[in-house]
Amino acid sequence: MPEMSNKYVPAHMHDKNPNPKLIKFVGKVTDNIVTKLRGVKTTDPEYWGFACIFEDELTKEESDLALNLLLKMKLRKKYPYEKVLKLANANSENRKQVDDIIDKLSVLGMLEYDYGDKYTKDGPMPNVKRERVDRHYWVPLFVPGSAEYTNMNKALMDRHPELAMFFERMTFLPLEHVTAMVPPGGAGIGMHVIPVEKAISMENQTMDIEHLSYWLKRYEGHLGASICSCRYGRKKLDEGCADDYEDWCIGVGDMADYCNETGRGHSITYDEAMAILKRAEDNGFVHQITNIDGENKIFAICNCNVKICNALRTSQLFNTPNMSASAYRAHVDKSKCVACGRCVEFCPTGALKLGQKLCKADGTQVEYPKQPLPDNNKWGKHMWDENYRDTARINCHETGTAPCKTACPAHIAVQGYLKLAAQGKYREALELIKRENPFPAVCGRVCNRRCEDECTRGKIDSAVSIDAVKKFIAEQDLKAEHRFVPEIVVASNKGRWKEKIAIIGGGPAGLSCAFYLASMGYYPTVFEKNKMPGGMLTYGIPSYKLEKDVINAEIEIMKQMGVEIKCGVQVGKDVTISELRKKGYKAFYVAIGCQGGRLPGIPNETAEGTSTAVEFLKVANTGNKKLSGNVVVIGGGNVAIDAARVAKRSGAKNVTMVSLESRENMPASVEEILEAEEDGVKIINGWGPKEILTKKNKATGVVLKRCVSVIDENKKFNPTYNENELNTLKADLVIYAIGQTIVWDNLLKGTKVEFGKGNSPVADTLTYQTAEEDIFVGGDVLTGPKFAIDAIAQGHEAAESLHRYVQHGHMTIGRNRREFVELNKDDILVESYDNSSRTEAGVNEKLKKQPFKDANKTLTEEQVKIETSRCLGCGVTVVDENKCIGCGICTTKCAFDAISLKRDHPEASKMVVAEDKFKHILPYAAKRATKIIFKKKNKDKK
């Protein structure tokens, strides 16, 4: 069972002489049957939760007066103000004292009041008086009621944070034995999901009470926004979701007046309420309404984040959807779905997961498991899901989904943007790509295309030219008038975040992090020590592969989003992390890459005429330096290829690459090797450097020794040589491309950041947080040299961590681990497909003559149509109707009109008053018991 938080020790948990009146009062209010039967103990949350109110917030005299009054009042029975005075034995002498205690109890959440609930479906009744004498008071339930009201009182919570624990316990203990017996509609317990209104606008059978606009119109003029009790309470328990806790709860009718008058909220207009609802939908929050007063009254609309919501927990923890679910269920049109995963990412319950659209080899469809329901099953703790917030974030079924999305480190919705491109919706395709990658134009030129390596179409003939299509889509981003600037979606009702975040390093990881922080509403600052941002994109990749205007165009979009980039600033030298903290920076993302080059450890390795590939390429990228004579490049990877090709294109007469590995085992890609040879680079394999020959400390040649093996019996890089077999090459310039190193200088001086192998930082594998809690790391500085797309993916994840950290959210609860499974390509049946062969963009022969111009063409629109038609459409979203609660958030995320809500369970819109709950629970429980018996009998017969 979920244990109570141990964040705080309730002050009154072990009272030796508890107030008997308080014991009696909380025993009356509680709906925990266990507590009612055995009596209230001081260790019960009912007692210590209210003891901090009656013992610490009130004087002894006030407490006695308050409890005497409250004990005379029946639970949830409304008493006119004059009747309350009479119950309190008010007279001319103590009238002010009684009024004061009534007001105090209202502010503290022990009393609730309204002005007669004078509303109709057409709106508020006219001429309703709203003075003190017009109020009706009552003792509220714990939930929904006083537990929320205490948690909505920020000052009270700050004095008594154990009230957050009280709220959490009172949404668990009374329900753990009941939820399985609750019928559709919730039986007047707690809260009820109400769908996104647009999602049900085409349904003919909807009821007024299923529409948010109906309730807002009913109470128009009496609407208010308040602190979200769940968000604030969970934040107090260090389990926050990182949302701003202000104004997500909309009080309606007299509740809005109650909250405004007791300091819990403020008035808002109908339009302001609708704006909050839209903002909630943008963030993926679930709309819920109170469900304890029947179908003619609600008192709040909540916009709930499943990571912290105590109401949604009642259905998700216990796996009992009747506690929350609306009358609707999601349905996917497989013919339209492209497995982009947007609906999956936002589904609060995990009802949506990515699966397989293609048939299995035997022609059958993959069968997906369904969540068992308590309707005809025995229920207990073995059926609960205590990790529901994490399991809801599992992206796909174990049988797998589209290989392209799985293989991509950033898990871009490849199938989705190919479909949009096929429809000519290029801007929408670009938007979809940028959900996961802010550098589509860059990656369209330099990505190593793991998506294509795994493309299912490759099993038939050739993979789809995914990267070429992406490049075409991204071309519009290069023109200022057509650039797509993403919408800023902030989990706050107060505008963009004020917290300052520093990103140290302006390479792909740092800039990706900045992009996604900006998209969440921050104004991050990037500190880059070089004159231009981009890191290895700018200084490491030759311009014939990636021209700098492409990088600059995509960086310009980040600036438009609010990213500030400060170049020429070296943190640790020009300013320290400590100084940045003093300037208000709350967190740091260190993504400085591996900007140093490794040396081979041989004689004369630093002689004049030697360079690391990193430094050589940086110089070349900042002004094409002319070369001549003989150049030797030591190394067999893609960086070595780049250095060799740049040297050749810069005028070197002879360029020779020396690789330890055989040609078949070279780290460089086959495509890169062939292009290098086409440029005139000579490659010799199976040799390593022994010594640099010099004359007057200037390199003149390289002595090589035969490499016998590269990998040892433990599968580790551990080359061995035949020192007797030597070879000598003439060299005017020797370039080492044998690895990269981290150059820290004084960047982390004085911090607690720990280091592992070599001088790489140690960080949590999920959050990237270091031992210095406000410092996070990522990109090549953490992983070692990898591809741009790997750094981009890490930067995206780092943005999530930084957001959670600066907003005091929990670092891992409800976090998408971004884990995907590839479908079994050996167990599929592809019966029909477009027979077109793979399309290549080709090369511009004129540009090819210019050594540092990108001569690769972009696909034409017609070629894009042909190429996108080759996609087999492997993946699809699968709905588990048993887990779906009909919130409709999925429909707001789908760009393909592939998911919709259907009114499958109209009985779930039955709203009843809390006092009648057992009139509905008991008959349902009896039917359920009968079903379970018959199910067992049928099972026994089999």
Regions found by a protein language model. Name each.
Residues 41, 93, 137-139, 288-301, ...:
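Ferredoxin-like iron-sulfur electron-transfer modules
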Residues 64, 78, 85, 109-116, ...:
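Iron-sulfur cluster-binding cysteine motifs and their immediate structural context
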Residues 122-173:
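Short, amphipathic alpha-helical interaction segments positioned at domain boundaries
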Residues 349-403, 418, 464-500, 519, ...:
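Flanking helices and flexible, charged tails adjoining ferredoxin-like Fe-S electron-transfer domains
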Residues 412-415, 421-422, 463-467, 503-571, ...:
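Beta1-alpha1 glycine-rich phosphate/pyrophosphate-binding loop at the start
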Residues 473-494, 553-573, 597-650, 755-771:
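Glycine-rich dinucleotide-binding loop and its adjacent helix/turn
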Residues 606-630, 711-785, 800:
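FAD-site-proximal beta/loop scaffold in flavoenzymes
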Residues 781-806:
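A conserved FAD-binding loop/helix module that cradles the flavin
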